[in-house]
Amino acid sequence: MIQQETYLNVADNSGAKKLRVIRVIGGFHKKYGTVGDIVVCSVREAIPNSDVKKGDVVRAVIVRTKKEIRRSDGTYIRFDDNAAVLIDKFNAPRGTRIFGPVARELREKGFMKIVSLAPEVW
């Protein structure tokens, strides 16, 4: 459950390290985001000399949440951290590598490029 002011780790090599959520995209007054939702974020930490700078406003897709996700077969999945991957306006990842596992729900939401770059899909 990702909401406004939530801090997210960045799971790619775009240059950002920490993000703070400004808004969850979708719906009318959508309060919470989960895996596969797009969020507008502010970069709070970034590595030097990277494409992304501290204070930049970026779009990202949530790939991991600490709050469990219920699947249609009745199983639940949760991760150790809240993480996102930066995306451009065409929903393609800005980085070239993805770190850590991502949820299978991304495939259903249409983020096939992120799923193909990820080392593990749970």
UniProtKB/Swiss-Prot annotation:
Q: Which Pfam families match?
A: Ribosomal_L14
- The question of whether RNA-binding is a record keyword is answered with yes
Report the domain of life of the source organism. Bacteria
One GO MF term: structural constituent of ribosome
What's any one GO cellular component for it? cytosolic large ribosomal subunit
- InterPro entries of this UniProt entry? Ribosomal_uL14 (IPR000218), Ribosomal_uL14_bac-type (IPR005745), Ribosomal_uL14_CS (IPR019972), Ribosomal_uL14_sf (IPR036853)
Q: Which family does it belong to?
A: Belongs to the universal ribosomal protein uL14 family.
Quaternary organization: Part of the 50S ribosomal subunit. Forms a cluster with proteins L3 and L19. In the 70S ribosome, L14 and L19 interact and together make contacts with the 16S rRNA in bridges B5 and B8.
Role, per record:
Binds to 23S rRNA. Forms part of two intersubunit bridges in the 70S ribosome.
Name recorded for this polypeptide:
Large ribosomal subunit protein uL14
The organism named in the record is Thermotoga petrophila (strain ATCC BAA-488 / DSM 13995 / JCM 10881 / RKU-1)
Q: Encoded by which gene?
A: rplN
